[in-house]
Each structure stands twice: as structure tokens, then as C-alpha cells.
């Protein structure tokens, strides 16, 4: 199975479209989104092509191939408009004998990791 990993779209239809094109071009089976999908956050400038109302249907059209974790700019209102789970702080993926912990990095990171065993991977 081929995975593509992306993060921090911040409502940019420009970057969401590029991500979707890369996903299709690379013939990936699944897309792992590491948060910050629709909102840019109060500390950030508007990203190029900011259009969250266009990003929503693009992502919802891929919902059967997505796994997503929450970013620091994601909120409950995002879950109301997205048709796939977006509010988990992390996801755990078994890969062979290892576990891959997928997270945005604002809760779990290299300084404050989730419970990792030797050889596990933190994204």
C-alpha cells in the first residue's frame, strides 16, 4: 500500500489542488493528513489561494482514502463540514513490526512523544 503524507493546507485551495494532483499522479492508495486543513489561524497570514469553502468538497471527495489527525488550527466546526474524522490528536498505524504514530506536532512531538517502543516511528 502506498501512502502520501500532507499537512498544513490552512484552507488553501491552491495547495489542496496541488496535493490532490500529486496524490493521483503518484497513484497513492491512502492520504494521511497531519492537520490544519481549513483555517489559517490567528498568527498566520492568509495562504495563497485561501478558499476553505472550495477545499471542503475537494477533501470530502477523497474521504474514503483519507486518514486525518487534528492540527492546532483545527476545531469542532471543521468536523461539522468535513465528512471524515478530523479531531483525533494522533493515529497509530501498524507497519510490519513497528508502529507509526502520526500527529500534527502541537501535542505530541520529539520533546513530548506518545508512548513509543524502540523502533517505532513518530511523524
What are these regions (language model features)?
Residues 5, 32, 102-104, 123:
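Structural motif
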Residues 2-95:
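Core catalytic region of metal-dependent phosphoesterases/phosphodiesterases
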Residues 67-77, 103-116:
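Hydrophobic transmembrane alpha-helix bundles
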Residues 87-88, 96-99, 106-123:
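Conserved beta-sheet core of the metallophosphoesterase superfamily
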